[in-house]
């Protein structure tokens, strides 16, 4: 990563601050955009204008859900000693020089507030640390987390307080992060706004088409094409079970890919046996052939019509809003008393009579 970014190894690892640019990184730190007290006003947050903003998806196996990295929460800590097995010394030096120990976390025991032990679950003499402010986080941390995959690359361990335990028994647990594709293999929604101001594109790796085996790169030709998803035809019990797994894993992507406002900016690159995926022993010729298809996919997008795309997105957004507003209008009369009463953060479920 440092070599690609043009950084001298003596300058330290590539950080998110390098990508943001010096001015944007300073604004990020000043506004504390990665903290709970960050300003909510879009006008204030709009002062942060990075030259390049990188986000990655990673899957938390312990909490069985995906997360965006850099994290938007401060609940995950790392152990400097544990991470010696995962990252080189200069990456850990950057982390340790810019991070800090977490503030005390307490729980009530016998009527007294008692601090939860924040020492590593494996190294009892080492305190865990919070990740530094996002501009100071090495990019390789997110890359390593999002690329982890069972058997091939080890998952990355963090630690977090388990608040699901009973009061008095809460403490740190190990929390494992692996490949973001375990939860969503095509998170193009990462980059979307309801009404886009800039185009975003995706390349989707798929199987060859049965009727067009020689067409290795494909993009729908117009608004009326690509309306239906590819059928997953199976004729055996094994195929059925495979379809069950694929549906559980890919149903979100399956709904998005043929949707209006999505399919016009997605190019299929079709891969055969021995290409892509978990094939780690591809020949240089195979890799070059895949690279050529990637070039062709980019060329398919050269005639992308952003005006047409914005019109389609506007129509779908307005249609969705109309449907939502109609439902809100129908229910609004019954919500008046609750809205006037306001929100009670300390409200206990099941205590309606107390209100």
Predicted regions and their residues:
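Patatin-like phospholipase
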Residues: 1-355
């Amino acid at each position: 990563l440092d070599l690609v970014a043009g950084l001298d190894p003596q300058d330290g690892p590539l950080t998110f601050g390098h990508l943001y640019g010096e001015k944007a990184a300073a604004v990020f730190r000043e506004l504390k955009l990665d903290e709970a007290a960050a300003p909510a006003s879009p006008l204030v947050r709009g002062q942060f204008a990075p030259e390049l903003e990188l986000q990655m998806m990673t899957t938390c196996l312990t909490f069985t859900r995906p997360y965006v990295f850099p994290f938007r929460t401060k609940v995950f800590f790392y152990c400097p000693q544990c991470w010696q097995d995962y990252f080189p010394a200069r990456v850990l030096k950057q982390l340790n020089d810019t991070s800090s120990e977490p503030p005390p976390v307490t729980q009530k025991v016998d009527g007294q507030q008692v601090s939860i032990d924040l020492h590593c679950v494996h190294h009892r003499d080492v305190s865990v640390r919070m990740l530094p402010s996002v501009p100071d986080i090495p990019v390789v941390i997110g890359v390593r987390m999002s690329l982890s995959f069972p058997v091939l690359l080890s998952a990355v361990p963090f630690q977090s307080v388990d608040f699901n335990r009973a009061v008095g028994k809460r403490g740190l647990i190990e929390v494992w992060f692996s490949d973001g594709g375990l939860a969503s293999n095509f998170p193009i929604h990462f980059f979307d706004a309801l009404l886009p101001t800039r185009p975003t594109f995706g390349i989707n790796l798929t199987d060859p088409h049965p009727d067009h085996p020689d067409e290795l790169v494909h993009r729908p030709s117009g608004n009326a094409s690509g309306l239906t998803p590819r059928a997953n035809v199976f004729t055996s019990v094994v195929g059925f079970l495979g379809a069950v797994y694929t549906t559980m894993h890919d149903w979100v992507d399956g709904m998005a890919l043929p949707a209006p406002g999505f399919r016009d900016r997605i190019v299929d690159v079709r891969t055969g046996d021995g290409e892509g995926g978990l094939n780690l022993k591809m020949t240089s010729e195979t890799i070059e052939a895949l690279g050529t298809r990637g070039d062709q996919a980019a060329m398919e997008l050269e005639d992308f019509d952003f005006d047409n795309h914005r019109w389609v997105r506007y129509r779908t957004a307005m249609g969705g809003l109309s449907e939502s507003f109609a439902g809100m209008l129908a229910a609004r009369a019954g919500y008046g008393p609750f809205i006037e009463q306001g929100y009670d953060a300390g409200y206990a479920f099941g205590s309606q009579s107390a209100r």
